[in-house]
Amino acid sequence: MEPFDIVINNAGVQNEEDIDVNLKGTIGITEKYGIRPGIRSVLMIGSASGHNGSEFPEYVASKGGVLSYTKNVALRIANYGATCNSLDFGGVLTDLNLPVIEDKALWNQIMEQTPLKRWMTVEEAADWAYFITVTNHFCTGQNILIDGLEAGNAHFVWPEEPTV
């Protein structure tokens, strides 16, 4: 397999496998493919919840671990001239979030507490990923919170039992 210029860790789940997938999976992929000469950029997809703690405990812990690991990787690959950052999104309109989006009562509650009254589109997320991995050559070791100011209302806590 040809070496990669860019590694993007985008795996994420919200279930009993949070730590294994979100944190250990990110570490495993990065250690295998991202820590080497020739790497240009490693991108972690974190979560606003890693900053504000407003989701399920295992998920928050796994994404908080990704934030710390981002800085560790940035220090280790800087001597290759490479960058490592995390993009820590709030709500994103994906199929994985359909149960939340389709639960009108929950969706309305979330939108009441979301300053921009919308979630990020997949295209907006891709634009950020492109910028931080391709255009950027200097910013490194940063956990970049892109949440439409959801963190400004960090008192919102997800219900214990998600509505499906």
Where are these regions (language model features)?
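Short, small/polar-rich loop/turn modules that mediate ligand/substrate recognition or access, typified
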Residues: 78, 83, 139-142
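Conserved SDR Rossmann-fold cofactor-binding beta-strand/turn motif
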Residues: 83-93, 145-147
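Conserved catalytic-site loops of classical short-chain dehydrogenases/reductases
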Residues: 5-6, 40-45, 82-85
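A glycine/serine/threonine-rich, flexible loop-to-helix segment
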Residues: 79, 89-113, 155-164
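C-terminal substrate-recognition "lid" of short-chain dehydrogenase/reductases
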Residues: 118-146, 151
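Conserved NAD(P)H cofactor-binding loop of Rossmann-fold oxidoreductase domains
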Residues: 10-15, 149
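Catalytic loop of short-chain dehydrogenase/reductase
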Residues: 41-79, 91-92
